């Protein structure tokens, strides 16, 4: 039961930086998978992602790359055998690598983003989340989570992002489950809402297919008892406020959006401990810049590039 909630917390942690990130099943896996042995109540997940620089489509001689690291601690606190509380804390750091192969002038309108990220390229969030879950209804899993992300360098309400996620999963059979929910986000002069909708299907014991918008489009195959192979459509999103300075972008807002196709190998050393490496090709990415009121949006699209990364999970 606890691992069901571990996967749920992993999902919500990723949602804080993006509505879609490479995550596991939106509401966890079937309960029977984790009855032997039981999982621990506390978990730590750490992940690294690097997307190599790709040329902008409309900005000559300029390119953009992206690097992200995050670590999350999460806990499942049962009140009864079928319900309890969820708590997590997370650190997220992202670096936007905007480069130019020739010298630019700060009066050049095509150099707006370049100088903004030359001034500051590394941004951080810390987050706290709290919620509750229940497995009391037959064949259903329900959970709700309230989350807030703040800038550790500028802790104020206006610089944060806040979410409420309601999620449910119905087990129609041992092989098929339906996921339904909603993701609500406010902050940085914007409001967003996404439906959480899809399914998880196991056509055979070793193969799992997930199609859950907007968080999980993946396939996993268990090669051996200690190795899984996977393929996924990854979506990456990072939204942040620029610092106050003398530039045109002062206290404006940027949003990085990425879409990638990946393959992965996961090694399971013993129950609850695993290491995963992944890589692939990014397709159709862009970055947007707005003023402090989230107006006057400028969108810059860039091409494809390689990406790679890894993650580690520890339960105790």
Curated annotation (Swiss-Prot):
It comes from the Bacteria. Belongs to the chlamydial CPn_0441/CT_007/TC_0275 family. This is Uncharacterized protein TC_0275. It comes from Chlamydia muridarum (strain MoPn / Nigg).
């Amino acid at each position: 039961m606890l691992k069901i909630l571990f996967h749920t917390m992993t999902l919500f942690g990723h949602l804080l930086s993006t509505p879609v990130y490479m995550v596991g099943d939106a509401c966890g896996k079937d309960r029977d998978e984790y009855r032997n042995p039981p999982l621990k109540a506390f978990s730590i997940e750490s992940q690294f992602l690097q997307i190599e620089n790709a040329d902008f489509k409309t900005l000559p001689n300029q390119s953009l790359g992206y690097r992200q690291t995050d670590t999350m601690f999460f806990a499942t606190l049962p009140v009864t055998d079928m319900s309890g509380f969820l708590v997590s804390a997370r650190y997220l750091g992202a670096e936007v690598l905007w480069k130019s192969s020739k010298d630019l002038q700060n009066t050049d309108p095509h150099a707006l983003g370049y100088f903004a990220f030359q001034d500051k390229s590394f941004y951080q969030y810390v987050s706290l989340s709290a919620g509750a879950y229940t497995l009391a209804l037959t064949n259903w899993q329900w959970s709700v989570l309230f989350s807030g992300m703040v800038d550790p360098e500028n802790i104020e309400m206006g610089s944060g992002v806040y979410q409420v996620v309601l999620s449910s999963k119905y087990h129609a059979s041992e092989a098929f489950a339906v996921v339904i929910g909603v993701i609500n986000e406010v902050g940085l002069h914007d409001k967003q809402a996404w439906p959480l909708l899809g399914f998880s299907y196991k056509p055979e014991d070793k193969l799992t297919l997930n199609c859950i918008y907007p968080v999980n489009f993946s396939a996993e195959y268990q090669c051996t008892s200690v190795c899984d192979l996977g393929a996924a459509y990854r979506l990456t999103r990072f939204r942040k406020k620029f610092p106050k300075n003398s530039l045109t972008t002062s206290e404006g807002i940027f949003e990085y959006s990425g879409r990638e196709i990946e393959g992965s190998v996961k090694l399971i050393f013993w129950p609850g401990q695993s290491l995963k490496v992944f890589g692939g090709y990014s397709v159709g990415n862009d970055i947007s810049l707005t003023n402090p009121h989230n107006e006057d949006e400028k969108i810059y699209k860039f091409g494809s590039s390689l990406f790679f990364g890894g993650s580690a999970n520890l339960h105790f």
